[in-house]
A protein has these predicted regions:
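Exported/periplasmic ABC-transporter solute-binding proteins
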Residues: 1-37, 41-50, 56, 60-65, ...
Length: 227
């Protein structure tokens, strides 16, 4: 079970994982938000899962709640946040804090997710830019496990932000542009063995592979950085 940021990398690695595990891999990609299908709620309902891949601080919270085993946690990737627009739209000017401030003030609508990037946007970024009062009322949460890029491609929001790796696979969007360095937030993603895993030893072996140099190239191709 993985959050969106690692989904593309995981899907690319499935053939290797299946050879290693000698079993077919079933993937559930969903949000770390609070909806019924969120990873937290699915774990709390007792769904049988072998591996959980989410932001490291979320995984440690799952460990504290007894949903994930403490043994075997490994960092598998790091990711930055980017903005994107609909295909055919001009490239947004977000090369500096002041440029991003102007762009967000001028945008008619802004999309964000319930995951790490959205929490950073609503809880910190716009406050640091001093524009929370102007920007948050025209910002829209893209929930239900849907990617922000999909809403951008449909024209439902003019601009949106999410992890780079979550924007890259989405058709119909363009100009995926990372936040300026002074405002960038790098999230660390980690994998752990679910407490109800039927085969913890096999799950740990897969996690070791995901954190190893053998998986690094496929992970980097999806817009993530490796440990």
């Amino acid at each position: 079970m993985t959050s969106g940021a690692f989904t593309a990398a995981h899907l690319a690695l499935i053939p290797q994982v299946e050879r290693l595990a000698k079993a077919k891999v079933v993937t559930a990609s969903t949000s770390i938000g609070t909806g019924e299908t969120s990873i937290a709620n699915r774990l709390k309902r007792g769904e049988l899962v072998d591996i959980v891949i989410v932001a490291e601080h979320v995984l440690r919270q799952f460990i504290a709640e007894g949903l994930v085993l403490a043994e075997g946690l490994r960092v598998v990737a790091r990711s930055g946040i980017a903005f994107a627009v609909r295909e055919g739209a001009p490239r947004p000017d977000i090369g500096s804090a002041e440029a991003l401030r102007r762009t967000l003030l001028a945008a008619k609508s802004i999309g964000f997710s319930a995951s790490e990037s959205g929490k950073y946007f609503t809880g910190e970024l716009v406050q640091r830019l001093g524009i929370a009062g102007e920007v948050l009322p025209k910002s829209r949460l893209i929930g239900g496990g849907e990617r922000v890029g999909t809403a951008i491609a449909r024209g439902e929001v003019e601009i949106g932000l999410q992890q780079v790796s979550e924007l890259m696979p989405v058709p119909g969007i363009a100009h995926i542009t990372p936040l300026p360095p002074e405002l960038q937030k790098i999230s660390t993603f980690a994998a752990g063995v679910a407490a109800r895993s039927p085969d913890p030893a096999r799950a740990r072996a897969v996690i070791e592979f995901l954190a190893s140099p053998r998986a690094a190239e496929a992970i980097r191709k999806t817009g993530l950085e490796t440990p």
